[in-house]
A protein has these predicted regions:
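Extreme N-terminal starter segment of soluble prokaryotic enzymes
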Residues: 1-4
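Conserved N-proximal alpha/beta basic substrate-recognition cap immediately N-terminal to
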Residues: 9-111
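Short acidic-glycine loop/turn motifs at beta-strand connectors
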Residues: 36-37, 161-165, 218-220
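A short linear hydrophobic-aromatic micro-motif
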Residues: 113, 146-148, 210-213
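Protein kinase-like catalytic core scaffold
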Residues: 125, 167, 211, 223-225
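Phosphate-binding site of ATP-dependent enzymes
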Residues: 125, 129-206
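C-terminal active-site "lid" helix and adjoining low-complexity regulatory extension at the edge
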Residues: 190, 204, 208, 217-255
Length: 255
């Protein structure tokens, strides 16, 4: 049996994982699924040895209809077969940032003051879309309902959890959203064990066994922001000399 990697090598996150997997399926490949006979074909050849898989949709190139549909074809195939995959029981089809904030709060993680509205009476706030995909900006007024959240000034921290393993990092930047800062850098850091256990409990509640949780840290401590279910990791992996990508591959065997 074989461990498969699905994505495209123009995605640096897939490229760094490529050496650790037995076989690779390009997201733009010719993929067919004969549902009547229940046979999956890749480039005309039947797949008979698919035991586990890591999947990532390529956001570094245009998402053509073929690539879009290939991703969901494979997702549906994996879901209906005994194939090991991270977050396989995570069935939410829509973004659940707001739901996750409520669960995090229930578990004792501190969250910033948060409203979903078009205008807040609070000042010193930031705006971000409910569905994600856009960068965070300052403000308290939007033209449609957005997340309007207390602005926390401090350190950006990220905690990766892969089954029972974890890796903690800080993104060093002077920008509100580090994605707007080409000079941002990543360093290894520490997050206290109490917070780590709460995040693991949160992920268990969400049926996740792989993800990255983002925090801000100020003089009062850590503030939970969100959990990403398919995060980018290549810049972080470099700081631990490939240990993150190796863990992603190895922990597939422990699900």
């Amino acid at each position: 049996m074989s461990a498969y990697l699905f994505g495209q090598l123009s995605d640096p996150n897939i490229k760094v994982l490529h050496p650790y997997f037995d076989k690779f399926i390009d997201q733009a490949a010719n993929i067919e699924w004969d549902i009547t006979k229940d046979i999956l074909y890749i480039e005309g050849e039947p797949v008979t040895d698919l035991d586990s898989i890591f999947m990532r949709s390529n956001v570094f190139e245009e998402n053509t209809p073929k690539k879009y549909n290939n991703y969901y074809l494979m997702s549906n195939y994996i879901q209906s077969h005994k194939v090991v995959k991270y977050n396989k029981k995570y069935h939410y089809e829509t973004v659940t940032k707001l739901h996750n904030l409520i669960i995090a709060k229930q578990l004792g993680l501190r969250i910033p003051h948060t409203e979903v509205t078009e205008k807040s009476n609070r000042t010193d706030t930031i705006l971000k879309p409910v569905t994600g995909g856009q960068h965070t900006i300052e403000g308290n007024t939007a033209v449609y309902p957005c997340i309007i959240q207390q602005k926390i000034t401090g350190k950006n921290k990220r905690l990766y959890v892969i089954n029972d393993k974890h890796f903690a990092f800080e993104v060093v930047t002077d920008k509100l959203d580090y994605r707007d800062d080409p000079a941002s850098s990543v360093i290894v850091t520490e997050i206290d064990n109490v917070t780590i256990e709460k995040v693991k409990h949160l992920m268990h509640r969400l049926n996740l066994n792989f993800g990255a949780s983002d925090f801000m840290e100020d003089e009062e401590g850590l503030w939970y922001l969100e959990t990403n279910t398919n995060p980018m990791f290549v810049a972080f992996d470099k700081q631990v000399e490939g240990k993150l990508s190796k863990a992603i591959r190895q922990e597939l065997n422990n699900i």
